[in-house]
Amino acid sequence: MPQRLKQVYQDTIVPKLTEQFSYKNPHEVPKVVKITVNRGLGEASQNAKALESSINELSTITGQKPVVTRAKKAIAGFKIRQGMPVGVMVTLRSDRMYAFLDRLINLALPRIRDFRGISAKSFDGRGNYSLGIREQLIFPEIDYDTIDQIRGMDVSIITTAQTDEEGRALLKELGMPFRT
């Protein structure tokens, strides 16, 4: 079953962006390639339960099992040895990516307290967008009673856009609520 957002992209966004940026080839139109959801855990090296709950929460939110990221180097100031778990990460592509993006735009972001839109300045110069989420409770899949601590996550949306202007136009057409 094709994702709703993917269908909208193919039917309406591609022709609109082709006209706006006067692309000659339909493959020039920017598209979302992947979404990475990352959560760094400072206390994971001492607390295995925090790591386990983060894995469960991210797999519930994204629908895919996260990978445990480990420290590359030992850092004495942070009491971290090489190979210790320091976070969890999920890379979403294809249908799961579109499903997650749809839920993020239409369900999760509007549930943020005092939400007035997201910053349009978080582009990296190559059309990719990064967004920090302060608490996992904005996702409807997370049950308030089952969480042990409020933790945030970083969401990076990687596109094939060459410039920030193209990336912004793509995400705006997908429904991303940018602050005006």
Curated annotation (Swiss-Prot):
UniProt keyword terms in alphabetical order: Ribonucleoprotein, Ribosomal protein, RNA-binding, rRNA-binding, tRNA-binding
GO cellular component: ribonucleoprotein complex; ribosome
One Pfam family recorded for the sequence: Ribosomal_L5_C
Gene Ontology MF terms: rRNA binding; structural constituent of ribosome; tRNA binding
GO biological process terms, semicolon-separated: translation
Gene3D superfamilies documented for this protein: 3.30.1440.10
UniProt similarity note: Belongs to the universal ribosomal protein uL5 family.
Quaternary structure annotation from Swiss-Prot or TrEMBL: Part of the 50S ribosomal subunit; part of the 5S rRNA/L5/L18/L25 subcomplex. Contacts the 5S rRNA and the P site tRNA. Forms a bridge to the 30S subunit in the 70S ribosome.
Function noted in UniProt: This is one of the proteins that bind and probably mediate the attachment of the 5S RNA into the large ribosomal subunit, where it forms part of the central protuberance. In the 70S ribosome it contacts protein S13 of the 30S subunit (bridge B1b), connecting the 2 subunits; this bridge is implicated in subunit movement. Contacts the P site tRNA; the 5S rRNA and some of its associated proteins might help stabilize positioning of ribosome-bound tRNAs.
Protein name: Large ribosomal subunit protein uL5
Gene name of this polypeptide: rplE
